[in-house]
Amino acid sequence: MVLINGIKYACERCIRGHRVTTCNHTDQPLMMIKPKGRPSTTCDYCKQLRKNKNANPEGVCTCGRLEKKKLAQKAKEEARAKAKEKQRKQCTCGTDEVCKYHAQKRHLRKSPSSSQKKGRSISRSQPMFERVLSSTSLDSNMLSGHGALSDTSSILTSTFLDSEPGVGKISKDYHHVPSLASISSLQSSQSLDQNFSIPQSPPLSSMSFNFLTGNINETNQNHSNHQHSKSGNNWQDSSVSLPAKADSRLNMMDKNNSVGLDLLGHSKRISPISNSRVGEVSVPLEEYIPSDIDGVGRVTDKSSLVYDWPFDESIERNFSTTATAATGESKFDINDNCNRINSKSYSKTNSMNGNGMNNSNNNNINSNGNDKNNNNSSRQEHQGNGLFDMFTDSSSISTLSRANLLLQEKIGSQENSVKQENYSKNPQLRHQLTSRSRSFIHHPANEYLKNTFGNSHSNDIGKGVEVLSLTPSFMDIPEKERETERSPSSNYITDRPFTRKPRSSSIDVNHRYPPMAPTTVATSPGALNNAVASNLDDQLSLTSLNSQPSSIANMMMDPSNLAEQSSIHSVPQSINSPRMPKTGSRQDKNIHTKKEERNPLNNIHDLSQLENVPDEMNQMFSPPLKSMNRPDAIRENSSSSNFIIQGNSMISTPSGRNDLPDTSPMSSIQTASPPSQLLTDQGFADLDNFMSSL
């Protein structure tokens, strides 16, 4: 190992074999031995500072790196200085000889100027791309009234003139076209109705470029004779960019088009309608929006939108009879049915028409007269009309019908007096209302819908609500509407006179009020009204606890009770379970209820109508008679009611208004003692079991 200037050297074999310390070879080339570990990047000065506790040096020593950079910078500067000195010594600019260094620089500086001169000469003789006049110079020269243009040095910039032909580069000045604002300002001083066939911007109309051939065509069509004849200057003389022999191309304007714009000579006259701004392009709205949108009509039509609705005749008829009933358009079937109801001749054909109206229950809204059962074809034609498809959806029927009922109840309360007269004077109307209420109450939901919207098939039930669903609009309900204009769903509420009945305090949770006013026709026992059954059960609950079965049978067959219940359409078949009232004032309420319910029965004077339904009365009264086997229990000469027995049927006639029998079991028990004293422990136990079974 040889140590030279602090660096160790050894032969290559000894370095590979890790025998550096014992290497003494002299016949082989020596190599520098790398120091072990990482090389130290800290200078000696920084090492000394780290040993000193008082000093706080930086973590990384940059002294060596900075010195290297400084040394490299010095070397570069010295090399530049030497090169300059050498050029100075070899420069022969002062002598006749050509200098090697400075002559080359001068040639590089002079070459653009020579090409610039060539470009100018070529552009003047054969212009490759000629630029039109700028907007500022065009406005200033046209509005000043002088024919002489400003110098072309202000128009043709140096960037355009420096471009050599054939290089393939187009300067951005070529794309400069007079802006629309400059054109509008140019034309603002003149009338907008002036004909554009007289050219007002000669550079635009006198210059055209053919992109296929690359030729520039200049036409000075009557420019020197039209506007600039006063000053004696022509566009051709003042413009350097135009060639001298431009007259040979006067007829080229018809063959070529101008750059980016049509010729002003071909433009139309500006009318006052389209004089918003010169240069604007008007695009018709039908180009983007169809001329006839569904439900909107023609977009550009200035007429009212009322005439643009594409309604068919059937839709207009259905819509007018429901939504615009107050405007007088609903004249289709209303007058006919009003005359039918108010007429004094009650023939069989009229009654058949009335029953047909009640059974099919189209109620003069969907169509007039003969079209009641033939509306399906017109409804199917308009299934794709958007808004009407929503109303045919069965999910929206219940919500809209509920709102319709509320509106009809509010309106119907204002017509109490008129309906009382019609109800009392027209027995035919009472018969119609009776059959209608019976068809509504005693049929299931599907059968009611079937009877309400006509004898339709599977898909016609939802379609019948098409016009009905449009009714609950508070804007379209008239102040006074007739009875025949009512919707089918609210007939059972609004067609009867509004006689408010006292609220029942029955313990039955399923208690319902009787939906119809008292009439003379009783229903079959299979369609028993729940409200009537619960009412009668409450009345019989007192006697069922402390009386024999014979007394119950006597009370059921008592003519006074039958007369009282005949105004509520039905009598229950049998009493299976007793019921007890909750309050002590139950008996008084029952007495007042029976008095009020029996009052409307006195309005009926025609007993012959009751003979139309002997079978129904027979079906109603036959089970109690057979089950109890007590025909002698009927008191025919009772003070409260009379019975006419014809074969198997029995018809009750109303008695006096306030004649309550004093001998009936119900009245005797009600006046005897309060119900709290009638119950024993066994009675309370039975009542508890009965309530738990409910």
From Swiss-Prot:
Q: Does the keyword Zinc apply?
A: yes
| Sequence intervals crossing the membrane | none
* Main location group: nucleus
Q: Which SMART domains match?
A: Copper-fist, Cu_FIST
Composition skew (Polar residues), residue ranges? 111-126, 336-349, 566-577, 664-677
Cited InterPro entries: Copper_Homeo_Regul (IPR051763), Cu_fist_DNA-bd_dom (IPR001083), Cu_fist_DNA-bd_dom_sf (IPR036395)
Q: Does the keyword Hydrolase apply?
A: no
Renumbered residue ranges of the record's region Disordered: 104-128, 209-240, 332-388, 479-514, 566-588, 650-677
| Keyword list, A-Z | Activator, Copper, DNA-binding, Metal-binding, Nucleus, Phosphoprotein, Transcription, Transcription regulation, Zinc
Q: Could you name the domain of life of the organism this protein comes from?
A: Eukaryota
Q: Which residues carry this modification: Phosphoserine?
A: S125, S231, S241, S291
Q: Where in the cell is it found?
A: Nucleus
Entry's Gene Ontology BP terms: cellular response to acidic pH; cellular response to stress; intracellular copper ion homeostasis; intracellular iron ion homeostasis; positive regulation of transcription by RNA polymerase II
One matching Pfam family: Copper-fist
Binding-site positions, Zn(2+): C11, C14, C23, H25
Recorded GO CC terms: cytoplasm; nucleus
Question: Its Gene Ontology molecular function terms?
Answer: copper ion binding; DNA-binding transcription factor activity, RNA polymerase II-specific; RNA polymerase II cis-regulatory region sequence-specific DNA binding
Record feature DNA-binding region, as residue ranges: 1-40
According to the UniProt entry, which residue ranges have a biased composition of type Low complexity? 350-378
Other remarks on this protein: Present with 339 molecules/cell in log phase SD medium.
* Biological function: Regulates the transcription of a set of genes, many of which encode membrane proteins. Among the genes regulated are YGR138C and YRO2. Does not seem to be dependent on copper.
Name this protein carries in UniProt: Transcriptional activator HAA1
**Origin species:** Saccharomyces cerevisiae (strain ATCC 204508 / S288c) (Baker's yeast)
Record gene name: HAA1
